[in-house]
């Protein structure tokens, strides 16, 4: 599966319901939204984890350690770029 499609699924799963700024969710909740043929394979899981890290490093996702788990949310300062990517 192409990386841009997986990035789109990650971002869309955080847009609805809205997870901008201080409203965040666990990474495992994002992984639940993927088709089974991707999320059940080790290669698919590694690719999802890699692309989440890429989005964090690009500044599109904010990360926070909460309740012992890593939580992420969309960066509200990058909203224009995120919405442009999704169109």
Predicted feature residues:
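Short, amphipathic alpha-helical interaction segments positioned at domain boundaries
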Residues: 77-87
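Minor-groove-contacting beta-hairpin "wing" of winged helix-turn-helix DNA-binding domains
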Residues: 68-74
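Short coil/turn segments at secondary-structure boundaries
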Residues: 24-26, 66
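Short, hydrophobic-biased segments on the C-terminal half of alpha helices
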Residues: 45-53
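Short helix-coil junctions and helix-kink-helix linkers
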Residues: 28-45
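Short alpha-helical segments that sit at the start of domains
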Residues: 1-22
């Amino acid at each position: 599966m192409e990386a841009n499609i997986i990035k789109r699924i990650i971002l869309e799963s955080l847009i609805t319901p809205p997870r901008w700024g201080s409203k965040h969710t666990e990474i495992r909740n994002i992984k639940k939204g993927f088709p089974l043929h991707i999320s059940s394979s080790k290669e698919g899981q590694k690719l999802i984890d890699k692309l989440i890290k890429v989005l964090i490093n690009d500044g599109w996702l904010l990360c926070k350690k909460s309740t012992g788990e890593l939580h992420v949310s969309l960066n509200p300062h990058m909203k224009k770029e995120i919405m442009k990517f999704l169109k």
